[in-house]
From Swiss-Prot:
Entry GO MF terms: ATP binding; metal ion binding; protein folding chaperone; protein-folding chaperone binding; unfolded protein binding
Location of the protein in the cell: Cytoplasm
An example Gene Ontology biological process: chaperone cofactor-dependent protein refolding
Pfam annotation, one family: Cpn10
Protein name, UniProt field: Co-chaperonin GroES
Provenance organism: Chlorobium phaeovibrioides (strain DSM 265 / 1930) (Prosthecochloris vibrioformis (strain DSM 265))
One GO location term (cellular component): cytoplasm
Keyword vocabulary terms for this entry: Chaperone, Cytoplasm
Family: Belongs to the GroES chaperonin family.
SMART domains found in the cross-reference section: Cpn10
Quaternary structure annotation from Swiss-Prot or TrEMBL: Heptamer of 7 subunits arranged in a ring. Interacts with the chaperonin GroEL.
PROSITE patterns linked: CHAPERONINS_CPN10
General function of this protein: Together with the chaperonin GroEL, plays an essential role in assisting protein folding. The GroEL-GroES system forms a nano-cage that allows encapsulation of the non-native substrate proteins and provides a physical environment optimized to promote and accelerate protein folding. GroES binds to the apical surface of the GroEL ring, thereby capping the opening of the GroEL channel.
CDD domains: cpn10
Length: 95
């Protein structure tokens, strides 16, 4: 992938949607919930504070993160689906 996010934006590879329920029933594509977690693949340089200082990003490539259901913009690059979102759309880093 040759994408580099700008400023405080983050590129996330969403986790795949569940294919079947815990009981073993297969879920059709129309019934699948969008996952609200994924892996960070790239981060921007950060954002500028009011004083003009560059604030470092709290996430880094490889982090597993939780984000809002409607966060980010969906993009497809080289057949792969990604989300581009602001750092503030990320709720937590999974440890």
């Amino acid at each position: 992938m040759n994408l580099k996010p700008l400023a405080d934006r983050v590129i996330v590879k969403p986790a795949p949607a569940e294919e079947k329920t815990k009981g073993g029933l297969y879920i059709p594509d129309t019934g699948k919930e969008k996952p609200m977690y994924g892996e960070v693949v790239a981060v921007g340089a950060g954002k500028m504070s009011d004083s003009g200082q560059l604030l470092e990003m709290p996430v880094k490539a490889g982090d597993k993160v939780l984000y809002g259901k409607y966060s980010g913009t969906e993009v497809s690059v080289e057949g792969e689906d990604y989300l581009i979102m602001r750092e503030s759309d990320i709720f937590a880093i999974l440890g």
